[in-house]
Structures are given as C-alpha cells and as structure tokens.
Amino acid sequence: MTQTKKILSLLNENGSMTQGKLAEAIYGDKLHGPNIYSALMTLVNRRRVIRTGAHPALYSLADGSANEGRRTLSDDSCFVSANIKSVSMSPEEAVRLIREYYNETIVDPHGRYLSWVHCYKAFYENRNTTNEETIDHLALHLAFYLASWGMYRGSSFLLQKDYKVHIPVVRIILEEKYNPLLGISAEELQKKCNLALLNEISMRIRRSYAAEQPAFDGTINNTTNTLVTKILLGTLGCVPAYDRYYVQSVKNRGISSGNYNSNSVAAVARFYCQNIETFEKLRKELSLSEVEYPPMKLMDMCFWQDANIQDKT
C-alpha cells in the first residue's frame, strides 16, 4: 500500500489526525513526520484531504475521498449498488436480536440506553428551530446522550469540554437542507442524493470539532467515525453507530466491510430492504412506545446486540 493510500485509510478510520499521529501509525514513530509531509501535501493540494488549524494542524478527508472498493453507479440511476457478500443472518435472527436489545433497555426506567430515546425525541420535536434557548437545550441533550454511550471516557477530547462545544454541530444538524435524513427510510438512504447529504454533514461535523480550541492538556480534537455516527444516530437516526460492536458484527455477518462510507451505509440499508416486511412490522411495534424508531436504529440494535453476545461467549 502506498503512503497516500495509507494516509487516506487512516483518516477514513480515525477522522481527524495530526501529521505526527499519521507518522506514528504508519512508521511507529512521530519523528517520521517529515517522511509523510510530501504525500500529505499532495493530498491537500488535490483537495482530497483538508488541513485545519495549526501547531499542530489537523488533517481530515474531504468529501468523497473515502471509498469502499469500487462504487457501481449507473448514470441513469439514483441508487448506490452496494456490493454485499454472502449474508449470514436471517431476518428471524435479526428480529430476535433487536427484541433482546429493546427488552434490555426497558428493564430500568432510567437506564443509560434510554438516553438515545430522549435525545432523538428532543431533536425530532425541535426540527429547524432557531431559538437560542432551544439550541442550547439540544446541545445539553446531545452531550448527555454521548456520555451515556461512552464518548466521554478515556482519551476523548470531549472529556475536557463543556456541553456548549456541541452548539455549532447542533446548528448544522438543524439546517433545513438535512431534513431528508431525519428518520430516513432504508430505501431513501440508498439514493445517491441522500448519501451525498450524509457525507456532507459528516464532514461538517468533523470540521466543526476540529475548529474548536484543543483542550488544555493538549488533547487533539479527534472526531472519529464512532463519534460522528453516534451523533447522527442520536439526532437524525439516519445511520447506525459505527462503534466496535457494530463494525465487528457487520463484517462477520457479511453485510459490509464496516468502514464508514456510502457503500457501507447503502449495504445495511439494502439488508433492511431485503427483509422490509419483517423489519417494518417490528419497527411499528416498537414505535408504539415513546418514539418512532427509524430503520437505522433497528439495524444499530441488531448488530450491536449480535457482537455483544459474541463478546460474552
């Protein structure tokens, strides 16, 4: 693999990275930073990579730079044709996994997994608001949801920030242009126009956090795929959260490679559509409770629970 391909692969996997972090990942030593400078600048000049800030600068993928294999888009089609391997999960097994996950969330009326319900409902009910007090309230909802879902632990830069760091991201999410992504159906999610919106909002979320002042302890504002997708799941319900369990399961089950990009998202949407009667019946059943569950939330529950069970055995 060439140096440029390694850089693109690392940025696709980790979000924003410094030159030193890239060098360490490629060569095992930050001191090799100068060795990748030429390749990095070539990618920047070709507008495949974006440089943000300084001392140290952060690098992230530009729109459309991350591809999973070869996309097969016909000129007269508005859908992405997702290349799926032999899928090793039946709709019956998927329903069982989703039910198991759901039943575990309702045991405790104040359980942490209900933070998704509260967050998604708040954003759903306040769509396109411009009220500053409401935006502040939504940022607080987002912060607590992310904390409940493990995004404020370890080396996360969010650990050193207050909830208001999310306000610029909330403003982006509330823009009218992203209305098609709210609770999007699996069929609509396979359309090129909506996948382009998803790519765009993902990149804008990365840039927003990258533009924030680094924490006082020097922690880089590294917006990972996990963080971006958890934000999108909790606010728009348009994509599963690409955390360790989800990625592990979709790879093992032959759904997709687990990389966060258009083909991977289209693949899980296609899996839903292939079993749409079964999944829609279950979705309507679950939606009789506090919130209407979007299709991608069901897929998140399914594959997370699958890997969670495997991890315990």
Regions from the PLM with identified roles:
Residues 9-12, 27, 233:
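Short, locally clustered residues in the helix-turn-helix/winged-helix DNA-binding domain
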Residues 40, 232, 236:
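DNA major-groove recognition helix of helix-turn-helix
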Residues 213-233:
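Helix-hairpin-helix
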Residues 15, 29, 239:
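Flexible coil/turn residues that form the inter-helical turn or adjacent wing/linker of helix-turn-helix
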Residues 71-219, 237-313:
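An N-terminal alpha-helical hairpin/helix-loop-helix interaction module that forms a charged
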Residues 2, 31-70:
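Charged low-complexity interaction tracts in eukaryotic proteins
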Residues 17-26:
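Short acidic, hydrophobic short linear motifs in intrinsically disordered regions
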Residues 1-14:
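Positively charged, polyanion-binding regions of nucleic-acid-associated proteins
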